[in-house]
Amino acid sequence: MSPQTETKASVGFKAGVKDYKLTYYTPDYETKDTDILAAFRVTPQPGVPPEEAGAAVAAESSTGTWTTVWTDGLTSLDRYKGRCYRIERVIGEKDQYIAYVAYPLDLFEEGSVTNLFTSIVGNVFGFKALRALRLEDLRIPPAYTKTFQGPPHGIQVERDKLNKYGRPLLGCTIKPKLGLSAKNYGRAVYECLRGGLDFTKDDENVNSQPFMRWRDRFLFCAEAIYKSQAETGEIKGHYLNATAGTCEEMLKRAFFARELGVPIIMHDYLTGGFTANTSLAHYCRENGLLLHIHRAMHAVIDRQKNHGIHFRVLAKALRLSGGDHIHSGTVVGKLEGEREITLGFVDLLRDDFVEQDRSRGIYFTQDWVSLPGVMPVASGGIHVWHMPALTEIFGDDSVLQFGGGTLGHPWGNAPGAVANRVALEACVQARNEGRDLAQEGNDIIRQAGKWSPELAAACEVWKEIRFDFKPVDTLDPNDKKQRDNEDTLADKFFGDKG
């Protein structure tokens, strides 16, 4: 390097390493309506001050790096840098803090969840100065939301397509999830739909394996759909899983489903990836297909309380990327999910405007500016005794999906579907009559079983089945509501089934 070049490069530049907090911790910053806001749960390494840890997150997820670089002088850092603008201690946890970071909108490509996540949950999660890091929530501003198509159709359009109103929809995942031939698989689909279900579903790991290639499955399932529709007079569907090893193959399967005239297909959005999911959502809107989303792999990312990404963030990302249904946990079944936390992200999926509510884990007010809503799917270890609780918790705009709770009926698949449909209709009627499902749920199911032998048999089989494990991911003590009665809703439902 010549002396002249060295002198010019050194003007206004001091090489070396300086604390992140000198540039990226700005407690006086007033957030803008166009900022993307993030709440991170930060656990610093011993000796690292919380302000430095929060600033490091802001820096490493936006414009910063580990040392000063002279090219900083070629742009406006004040315009593009992320800012840690508030830090609060987590009560009841040692050395754990919530760091709030604001990102300028220009840091992100329009309509790309992939780019959004690459920055905000990228390399910063491996930063050595942090023992653990978790993204608890995001505020997506209207200016950015408007760059996304979102769900292909949304809740109201789905109801209109299916001509089903005033109750939750009923589904069933076909079991065993792997190993059936296409013809036997289609037979199970037909029996469940004929028995009264609205949907059946491919399991998430059913793609195109040697025992059942995708094209054969699609054909036999389409036959089952049309036969059950003709016999019941109701519109039926099966979630045909279009997830594949390449986007081209995925879209080929979606095209074949459209040619068969089926109403809905399916995608595993986390294992398949956000780019593939957004592409499929666009195809579904253009071609009149509903899109069911499975969240396989989510617990790897969201289950641990101190590291990863909370599912409420993954739910928001899905609403941006596109999907008409997404699995959301059950509260009362076999899968992880605390009631208040689950209800929080269910509202974020369905509602147009959701206020900040820390008692449900919602850190920011979210305005979706009329982006279509997503139907939550309750699935995993549920059966007829859960029906009152599920109806109460999830309301009408939901899908209640019973796999083993349908196919495990002692009399077969169709009677299992009948039992679930009768239980649902009884709960909806009781609710509409003003009865308290929380207090009278078990009695409602018992009374309905007197005139439905299928339901009575199901009640007998599953009367002792419960999944009583405390959830791993819970609200922080300072975020919990003070309740007069600490009994959970599930406890009320499981009092006496005699």
UniProtKB/Swiss-Prot annotation:
<dbReference type="Pfam" id="PF02788">
    <property type="entry name" value="RuBisCO_large_N"/>
</dbReference>
<keyword id="KW-0560">Oxidoreductase</keyword>
<keyword id="KW-0479">Metal-binding</keyword>
<keyword id="KW-0007">Acetylation</keyword>
<feature type="binding site">
    <location>
        <position position="204"/>
    </location>
    <ligand>
        <name>Mg(2+)</name>
    </ligand>
</feature>
<comment type="function">
    <text>RuBisCO catalyzes two reactions: the carboxylation of D-ribulose 1,5-bisphosphate, the primary event in carbon dioxide fixation, as well as the oxidative fragmentation of the pentose substrate in the photorespiration process. Both reactions occur simultaneously and in competition at the same active site.</text>
</comment>
<feature type="active site" description="Proton acceptor">
    <location>
        <position position="294"/>
    </location>
</feature>
<dbReference type="InterPro" id="IPR036376">
    <property type="entry name" value="RuBisCO_lsu_C_sf"/>
</dbReference>
<comment type="subunit">
    <text>Heterohexadecamer of 8 large chains and 8 small chains; disulfide-linked. The disulfide link is formed within the large subunit homodimers.</text>
</comment>
<comment type="similarity">
    <text>Belongs to the RuBisCO large chain family. Type I subfamily.</text>
</comment>
<dbReference type="GO" id="GO:0009536">
    <property type="term" value="C:plastid"/>
</dbReference>
<dbReference type="InterPro" id="IPR033966">
    <property type="entry name" value="RuBisCO"/>
</dbReference>
<feature type="modified residue" description="N6,N6,N6-trimethyllysine">
    <location>
        <position position="14"/>
    </location>
</feature>
<feature type="binding site" description="in homodimeric partner">
    <location>
        <position position="123"/>
    </location>
    <ligand>
        <name>substrate</name>
    </ligand>
</feature>
<protein>
    <recommendedName>
        <fullName>Ribulose bisphosphate carboxylase large chain</fullName>
        <ecNumber>4.1.1.39</ecNumber>
    </recommendedName>
</protein>
<dbReference type="InterPro" id="IPR020888">
    <property type="entry name" value="RuBisCO_lsuI"/>
</dbReference>
<dbReference type="InterPro" id="IPR000685">
    <property type="entry name" value="RuBisCO_lsu_C"/>
</dbReference>
<dbReference type="GO" id="GO:0019253">
    <property type="term" value="P:reductive pentose-phosphate cycle"/>
</dbReference>
<feature type="region of interest" description="Disordered">
    <location>
        <begin position="473"/>
        <end position="498"/>
    </location>
</feature>
<feature type="binding site">
    <location>
        <position position="173"/>
    </location>
    <ligand>
        <name>substrate</name>
    </ligand>
</feature>
<dbReference type="GO" id="GO:0016984">
    <property type="term" value="F:ribulose-bisphosphate carboxylase activity"/>
</dbReference>
<dbReference type="InterPro" id="IPR017443">
    <property type="entry name" value="RuBisCO_lsu_fd_N"/>
</dbReference>
<dbReference type="Pfam" id="PF00016">
    <property type="entry name" value="RuBisCO_large"/>
</dbReference>
<feature type="binding site">
    <location>
        <position position="203"/>
    </location>
    <ligand>
        <name>Mg(2+)</name>
    </ligand>
</feature>
<feature type="site" description="Transition state stabilizer">
    <location>
        <position position="334"/>
    </location>
</feature>
<feature type="binding site">
    <location>
        <position position="295"/>
    </location>
    <ligand>
        <name>substrate</name>
    </ligand>
</feature>
<feature type="modified residue" description="N-acetylproline">
    <location>
        <position position="3"/>
    </location>
</feature>
<feature type="propeptide">
    <location>
        <begin position="1"/>
        <end position="2"/>
    </location>
</feature>
<feature type="modified residue" description="N6-carboxylysine">
    <location>
        <position position="201"/>
    </location>
</feature>
<keyword id="KW-0456">Lyase</keyword>
<keyword id="KW-1015">Disulfide bond</keyword>
<feature type="binding site">
    <location>
        <position position="177"/>
    </location>
    <ligand>
        <name>substrate</name>
    </ligand>
</feature>
<keyword id="KW-0601">Photorespiration</keyword>
<dbReference type="GO" id="GO:0004497">
    <property type="term" value="F:monooxygenase activity"/>
</dbReference>
<keyword id="KW-0934">Plastid</keyword>
<feature type="binding site">
    <location>
        <position position="379"/>
    </location>
    <ligand>
        <name>substrate</name>
    </ligand>
</feature>
<dbReference type="InterPro" id="IPR020878">
    <property type="entry name" value="RuBisCo_large_chain_AS"/>
</dbReference>
<dbReference type="GO" id="GO:0009853">
    <property type="term" value="P:photorespiration"/>
</dbReference>
<keyword id="KW-0120">Carbon dioxide fixation</keyword>
<keyword id="KW-0460">Magnesium</keyword>
<keyword id="KW-0602">Photosynthesis</keyword>
<keyword id="KW-0488">Methylation</keyword>
